[in-house]
Amino acid sequence: MLLALRRKAIHGIRFSSGKCGQNLSGSTIGPKFTSDKEVEEFLSKSTWDVREYVPSSVDEKLIPSEETVVRLLKISGLPIKNIDQIQIRLANQLSFINRLHNLPVDENINPNHARIIERNPTPLDYEGLIKGIASQQKSDSLGEISGSWDPTKTAAVKRDGFFILREGLLKGRD
């Protein structure tokens, strides 16, 4: 079931070696998932139901004219058929958007934090970064194998993992 969810909607969860965790290619948002059960619990939490905001009847004022729908279909390159159904669907979508716009908004919340993260994230500091680096583990599944990359591998002159520059290359530099 989880793999099907991953293919359809979840792009930030990585499954490897029986464990699941957030994709670490960017910044981490929230705690890591340690089991499939935690992922299922997270996804099963319902904060609100879309059906509460979907209209049960169509508001006649929101139904776009036939000319407008035909023009939108032409611009979109879509076939011009089933215009009555499209008008009703567009009216429902407009009604849904209007209801979302009319919801009360907490003005004290920073809109930059309007994601699935804590509302007041702690700022990064040097000690926290050093601890994070010290506890960071390499992932074989991402190709992070210790000693697998040698930056001086193709250098003509090198010693103990360092590049050696000849004196002639340094002339004329201040």
Swiss-Prot record:
The protein's UniProt keywords, in alphabetical order, are: ATP-binding, Ligase, Membrane, Mitochondrion, Mitochondrion inner membrane, Nucleotide-binding, Protein biosynthesis
- Protein EC: 6.3.5.-
- Topology versus the membrane, per the UniProt entry? Peripheral membrane protein
Domain of life the protein comes from: Eukaryota
Main localisation: mitochondrion
Cellular location(s): Mitochondrion inner membrane
Q: Name one GO cellular component term.
A: glutamyl-tRNA(Gln) amidotransferase complex
Gene Ontology MF terms: ATP binding; glutaminyl-tRNA synthase (glutamine-hydrolyzing) activity
Q: Which top EC class is given?
A: ligase
Pfam family, any one? GatF
Q: Which InterPro entries match?
A: GatF
Q: Which reaction does it catalyse?
A: L-glutamyl-tRNA(Gln) + L-glutamine + ATP + H2O = L-glutaminyl-tRNA(Gln) + L-glutamate + ADP + phosphate + H(+)
Miscellaneous remark of the record: This protein may be expected to contain an N-terminal transit peptide but none has been predicted.
Q: What does this protein do?
A: Allows the formation of correctly charged Gln-tRNA(Gln) through the transamidation of misacylated Glu-tRNA(Gln) in the mitochondria. The reaction takes place in the presence of glutamine and ATP through an activated gamma-phospho-Glu-tRNA(Gln). Required for proper protein synthesis within the mitochondrion.
SUBUNIT field: Subunit of the heterotrimeric GatFAB amidotransferase (AdT) complex, composed of A, B and F subunits.
Q: What is this protein called?
A: Glutamyl-tRNA(Gln) amidotransferase subunit F, mitochondrial
The organism is: Kluyveromyces lactis (strain ATCC 8585 / CBS 2359 / DSM 70799 / NBRC 1267 / NRRL Y-1140 / WM37)
